[in-house]
Amino acid sequence: MDALLQLKGIDKAFPGVKALSGAALNVYPGRVMALMGENGAGKSTMMKVLTGIYTRDAGSLLWLGKETTFNGPKSSQEAGIGIIHQELNLIPQLTIAENIFLGREFVNRFGKIDWKKMYAEADQLLAKLNLRFKSDKLVGELSIGDQQMVEIAKVLSFESKVIIMDEPTDALTDTETESLFRVIRELKSQRRGIVYISHRMKEIFEICDDVTVFRDGQFIAEREVATLTEDSLIEMMVGRKLEDQYPHLDNAPGEIRLKVDNLCGPGVNDVSFVLRKGEILGISGLMGAGRTELMKVLYGAMPRTSGYVTLDGHEVVTRSPQDGLANGIVYISEDRKRDGLVLGMSVKENMSLTALDYFSRAGGSLKHKDEQQAVGDFIRLFNVKTPSMEQAIGLLSGGNQQKVAIARGLMTRPKVLILDEPTRGVDVGAKKEIYQLINQFKADGLSIILVSSEMPEVLGMSDRIIVMHEGHLSGEFTREQATQEVLMAAAVGKLNRVNQE
């Protein structure tokens, strides 16, 4: 079968990192191609090369059999390649039709918008997807699932032959997911090709025909989904045994350091758990399960409505992040660029930002020599690759930025270290270094909470694992009990703490 779209031998490098090396992707008419790989495998970079956001360093792109280069998202969109991003690009205050044809409104011979034609065309697009609502409805009145359908209708308005869906079900309910799958089957029957990017195994086996696997920026394989099992697919993605990739330190945890009882807050309902000295507690669950919210309520970044937290036997109340820090709880955010780092400031300034009390004299002036000494020590300990501590942190790679974010947390000498997605967007080499650092903290008696969407990471690094589902704790497992299947069952609510035995 001839591919609608072919990318072959794609290379793309950024300063200090090769994001793609010989990567390839084929998209066939009437078939769904899953694109899979761990975080940092190169999936997003490949999509940006495909849609013209990034220029490829080497390789070829064949569109409908012809060698092509797109010079930006507009040209790829007009050629017939549509992309539906994880974050929806719709304006809630406008109608569905206005969103679909934004910037391309139908104009009559008098130069005025032809509303009648625009709504009629939009209604036709919605009918193609078997949607029951009309295009004069405000987008803000729709559910997230229906908004996603509007994004698909918008893509179809460009006569798209290939549609890329990036984590399309992350914010959807089960019913909305089923509606999406019905639409995907409809698109297949119209001979459109679909690229489906997801980390959810169940969906890959339910809706996809083929799968392409990337690892460390390289093309690993293209296979028919029917010929694979979940285990063989994971093996292709990971490329090595779990224990080789995740160096687990087998130390017995100490006494209880943190005790959480019936904690409630925004997106968090009646959660209880304990954390011991020298223990890594993994927190697993799907997107929207409440993992990050739980950590922010614990740390003081979100309000606690009820429940108790005790640290080393003393009750602590955290009404703000400052309270969390003062009590020895450090939170390293999943979004280091928004919550964690000031990209225009230097490595030194970022690293010492929350620990300035330790480097301040009584009058408030800084002991610059002490600050430089401490920052230099952490740069060496963490093997941060930077020309100097005065380098702007925005110029460092993702892995080195993350090391600085973690080092900053440790400068305050915490008792509890919360790592939320610590290796997101970090290359494989830096991941291994971060895992080794985590083990070092564990050996020093630090209590660590590891929140991660990467199930192998949670399984490989944790001593114990708790699973969140819709704001509740849906399972707690020892390292020996935990498997991908068990964690996934708890994550989708099939297990609960009563029947998990």
UniProtKB/Swiss-Prot annotation:
ATP binds at residues 37-44. The keyword Transcription does not apply. The complex is composed of an ATP-binding protein (RbsA), two transmembrane proteins (RbsC) and a solute-binding protein (RbsB). Its EC number is 7.5.2.7. SUPFAM superfamilies: P-loop containing nucleoside triphosphate hydrolases. Residues 5-241, 252-495 form the ABC transporter domain. It is a peripheral membrane protein. GO terms for cellular component: plasma membrane. CDD domains: ABC_Carb_Monos_I (cd03216), ABC_Carb_Monos_II (cd03215). Part of the ABC transporter complex RbsABC involved in ribose import. Responsible for energy coupling to the transport system. It is found in: Cell inner membrane. This is Ribose import ATP-binding protein RbsA. Gene3D superfamilies: P-loop containing nucleotide triphosphate hydrolases. InterPro entries: AAA+_ATPase (IPR003593), ABC_carbohydrate_import_ATPase (IPR050107), ABC_transporter-like_ATP-bd (IPR003439), ABC_transporter-like_CS (IPR017871), P-loop_NTPase (IPR027417). Belongs to the ABC transporter superfamily. Ribose importer (TC 3.A.1.2.1) family. The gene is rbsA. It is an enzyme of class 7 (translocase). It catalyses: D-ribose(out) + ATP + H2O = D-ribose(in) + ADP + phosphate + H(+). Keywords: ATP-binding, Cell inner membrane, Cell membrane, Membrane, Nucleotide-binding, Repeat, Sugar transport, Translocase, Transport. GO terms for molecular function: ABC-type D-ribose transporter activity; ATP binding; ATP hydrolysis activity.
